[in-house]
UniProtKB/Swiss-Prot annotation:
Family membership noted in the UniProt record: Belongs to the KRTAP type 7 family.
General function of this protein: In the hair cortex, hair keratin intermediate filaments are embedded in an interfilamentous matrix, consisting of hair keratin-associated proteins (KRTAP), which are essential for the formation of a rigid and resistant hair shaft through their extensive disulfide bond cross-linking with abundant cysteine residues of hair keratins. The matrix proteins include the high-sulfur and high-glycine-tyrosine keratins.
Record protein name field: Keratin-associated protein 7-1
Assembly and binders: Interacts with hair keratins.
GO cellular component, one term: intermediate filament
Keyword field: Keratin, Repeat
Ranges where the record places region 8 X 2 AA repeats of G-[YCGS]: 37-84
Pfam family, one: KRTAP7
Alphabetized InterPro entries for the sequence: KRTAP7 (IPR020184)
Superkingdom in the source lineage: Eukaryota
Amino acid sequence: MTRYFCCGNYFPGYPCYGTNFHGTYRATPLNCVVPLGSPLNHGCGTMYSSRNFCYGGISNFSNPGCCYGSSLYRPWGSGSGFGYSTY
């Protein structure tokens, strides 16, 4: 399985809290949709999280704009998340 990183440096390379494509809260690396070496890693280092949340309640506190739905960094355009498979 491809390793994915989450938003921020809090738990790099480890499971983080976020929403999957179904909108449910999970603590699993499957929520992280941007792999290492991705050209989209600008904006907040190499850490991205899925959808609109990082670590659940902490949100973008540490790295504003590095999550899906952000108004600051959204290099993927729509930010829907689809197009970067978590499976």
